Amino acid sequence: MAIRRVTISLNGQTYQLTKNTATGKYEVDVTAPTESSYNKEGHMYEMVLKVEDDAGNVTTVDRYHPLLGENMLLDVEERVAPVIVPIQPGEGAYLNNQTVQIQFDVTDNDSGVDRDSITLQVDSREIPDYEITKVATSGGYRCSYSGNLQDGGHTVEINARDHDGNTAIQKTVTFTVDTVPPTLDISTPAQGLVTNQRDCTVAGKTNDATSSPVTVTITINGADQGTVPIGGDGSFAKIVSLVGGTNTIRIKVMDKAGKSSEVSRTVTYNSTAPEVEGVEITPNPVDAGKIFKIMVDVTDE
């Protein structure tokens, strides 16, 4: 009897094989499925081969065939790497708490993220898997880690693969922990200064070992006095205008991590000269060589 038809089914499609007269074998070129086989049963695509002769007899070979079953399983591997997206902290962030929360997503839209391949390194320390919380999400995992870090700069490295062995592009995040406020020393004006000059120089020096440069703000009775230039050594000086009476001057310095220091000065501005309202001499006239009293009546605001 002659072979009437040879077909093979794969992923819902049926393909007709034709006989190669040179080899005597039945052949067909098939385009592999566009999706990985990892999420299929047994991580394989199942193929079913059917051979029919002229009499209508059919031989079927599938995954359960005792001799050829393994040949009916097709392993398809995708070639698109998973994607790592850092969430926090952001690149270049300044944090004012030594307890640092690290969070990132890893996703893959085909074979799926290999959970065990997700690794996190903080500076030179490889974080153990049991310290990383990995919560399944649509297409991957949201990963979280909380740890205590010393003040200073830090680097996070994140790596992952999918189930087909594709390696994600490593993500690196650098950030700074700074829990110490900047220093602030005010050289002028002196606390309690009383002056008849409207212009007053506010000067001092500031420094932050971790999060320089800092910003300095000056207010008088709550009114902002504008930009304060700071030198390379942290020194600053700004001429401000006082108002008549009591002036509460607040100088505040803040670093990039949001830590701040503040100094207050109270300065009184009085430009009104005292008034002489009366002069009395008793006795007048006075005998030569005798004592007399001078009394002056003055006022000042």
Feature-to-residue mapping (PLM):
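Extracellular acidic loop/turn motifs
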Residues: 1-3, 108-115, 207-216, 299-301
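Aromatic sugar-binding surface patches on proteins
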Residues: 22-34, 135-144, 231-237
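Surface-exposed, short loops/turns at beta-strand junctions within beta-sandwich domains
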Residues: 32-44, 146-153, 239-246
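Flexible, low-complexity linkers/stalks enriched in Thr/Pro that connect modular domains
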Residues: 65-82, 172-185, 265-274
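Short, solvent-exposed loop/linker segments at the N-terminal edge
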Residues: 92-98, 191-198, 284-290
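Short edge beta-strand/loop segments characteristic of extracellular beta-sandwich folds
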Residues: 101-109, 201-207, 293-299
